[in-house]
Amino acid sequence: MVELLEARGHAVTRFGRAADEDEAWGPTAVRVARAVAARDADLGVVCCWTGTGVSIAANKVPGVRAALCTDAETARGARRWNDANVLALSLRLTSEEIAKEILDAWLGEGYGGGEDASLAAVTDAEKAR
């Protein structure tokens, strides 16, 4: 995945196992999410066996909207309607070909607007924690 992103011209900061660090998925997902929330990275991609754990961990960081995507259309919608900024993937379910499709859809789409009130409600709930 890192090679695919770099081949498409994206600057990639590696965390956890992708950086040859012996770090579990939870702390790695939080580090990625913090980089996105701090605007040190525009977007983040996190992976674990199901994708669920990393999406939960990343979503604990204020300002992060992590979306677990198993196909390109879900990835496209997560960016367009939810302004998701962290992509979570399942290592078990996502083949290399599907990962390429998901990444292309994710990177090719931006927030389309029209969901500002819903996103503001999510942000308000986040602040109320």
Q: Model-derived features: where do they sit?
A:
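Mid-chain, well-packed structural core segment of small domains
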Residues: 46-47, 52-92
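C-terminal binding/interaction regions
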Residues: 72-129
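A short beta-strand-loop structural module common to alpha/beta enzyme folds
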Residues: 11-23
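Short amphipathic alpha-helical segments
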Residues: 1-3, 56-60, 100-101
